[in-house]
């Protein structure tokens, strides 16, 4: 354990503190061997943490996955075993003993397919070898096609209905097993399983149309917008001395209007630096324009979704989607958003008044002018996030060391570097970490693929390649066999048995979780040294590690409710909460290897006035998402996405609507998060409350970490999230998760600077 001692707070801004003694408390950390190993692993240009190994294996320790063709063979083997298990479940109605195993076998069937599908998803996005990536794509498409057949399999649905209708069988199910059964049942119901054949075929057709329209919508969202025509005289006085001067010279030399494309560096410079309002107005309108075809694609997508919902007896796509979420109904979502608007609008208006005063001074006006949409970046230029106190440069290795120390304080869990065997990882940059619990030993693995390279997917991502589940009760022999396919069956069995462990002080054998983190940081080099992260990169790592820790601790008997397999409007809570820890100087002191750095007590007290404006804009977008997936899409013959956006902006917004704009065609989350865009705001509100009420006072206190671990993390998706949150906050009034509970969460101000849109 790291030694702790309390010291008196000294208020003088000139006082210099040791890095290990930030503000109220100091945590003197003697660097352990694991601390030094983890720093060396990520900061050394040659990845110094290496042990000699003569053992050769395949991806993730699966000896058969040593070449792309073997992966395709594994997919074939998986299909054979999945069909055998499907047939077994279908025969269960003739045996009570088999009926008792239906929920377990459905979960096994799901895991059998998902463990290969999730691996394929990673390989096709991260593997540098084109042959592997192609194989990954093939396997993904092949198994997803079979999965879609199972999702609409009437026989499986009828067997599950038989189980849930038998009270004596239901009594034998644990709460976790019953929750798993309900998830399968709801998924079947959403797939029009109980409709006549013709209507089921229509469901399949509409689902296919939605995928096609969704892809087209996303292509349109990312398509370049036409340029804005900027007159030379509008460039006079531009504040940017580099690119701005070049644009002014170009305008003077050509004596013609400049054509500036939205999203370009020139466009960004104009929005932030042009003192004349007109070029900013033109750029804004150009950036938020749409063609009739782009609008038509979105509206066809929304109407097709609405038709799908009506087909299965729901009044709207939002009603269909929210059934199994914390919110439960669109009305509850609007209750939450309405309360959140009431909480946030005063802060947004106060911020706008600050910007209005800046605009008044800029133009020398006698009264406060209106802030327009194109004024935001000029009067409040976007600033990168900053730590709460000045810090020395933070390297990738020190961040992972700090994460390991934080997890040790909170949960008794540490990250331990270990060598990957030859063939186990897809690139030499990938590093392997064991996740070690002080009582239970090894509980999972994290593979960190953190450095940029050609062909690698961009951005940060978290992949749960394999979920946790209990395996000693599987009864593989009961699945039967198939003459002529013995080798394939054995191949899949061997694949499944890797990563299984007996957990000390816990019944049974468990398949341990396996997580991959993908980022694109600069690789350390001999010339430049270790990779130093910007603060937003540190926040991203903490966010993704929140997901990873949920996967590690949420070790359930059923994979369908393990780790991050939980409600969409709950899954971001652990990751957003992790970002809050970065607001604590006490936590930041864990980044110091030996206590050799010093820093000033004076913190970063600058408050971005635009933060509340941006949060309010997110609330408006979440409201728009609900409107776009409401019954009005079909009930109103004149439904127009552009009109709805204008009406919402006029009635609820704080910045005037701009005519001739149609931002909705670039709102890409409408496809991936249709009717659930509120989720991120919802989890931000809960995370803010949890931080304030549970962690802020003493963020490294083990008792607090254990409470969070036991009341939230360990359940994964196997318990009602409302019960978890109400227990954690000692707020019994939330347990019902009704309309009033949603309103109550909406009344919690989102007290953070951590919620960056797009980090999921």
Curated annotation (Swiss-Prot):
Enzyme kind, highest EC tier: hydrolase
Residues forming the catalytic site: 544
Disulfide pattern: none
Catalytic activity line of the entry: Release of an N-terminal octapeptide as second stage of processing of some proteins imported into the mitochondrion
Record carries keyword Translocase: no
UniProt-listed PROSITE patterns: ZINC_PROTEASE (PS00142)
A Gene Ontology BP annotation from the UniProt entry: peptide metabolic process
Annotated cofactor note: Binds 1 zinc ion.
Segments traversing the membrane: none
Compartment(s) where it occurs, according to its Swiss-Prot or TrEMBL record: Mitochondrion matrix
Cofactors required: Zn(2+)
Keywords (A to Z) from UniProt: Hydrolase, Metal-binding, Metalloprotease, Mitochondrion, Protease, Transit peptide, Zinc
Gene Ontology CC annotation, any one: mitochondrial matrix
Targeting presequence: 1-19
Positions with a binding annotation for Zn(2+): 543, 547
Presence of the UniProt keyword Transferase in the record: no
Documented EC number(s): 3.4.24.59
One annotated GO molecular function: metal ion binding
Similarity-based family: Belongs to the peptidase M3 family.
Function of the protein: Cleaves proteins, imported into the mitochondrion, to their mature size. While most mitochondrial precursor proteins are processed to the mature form in one step by mitochondrial processing peptidase (MPP), the sequential cleavage by MIP of an octapeptide after initial processing by MPP is a required step for a subgroup of nuclear-encoded precursor proteins destined for the matrix or the inner membrane.
Protein name: Mitochondrial intermediate peptidase
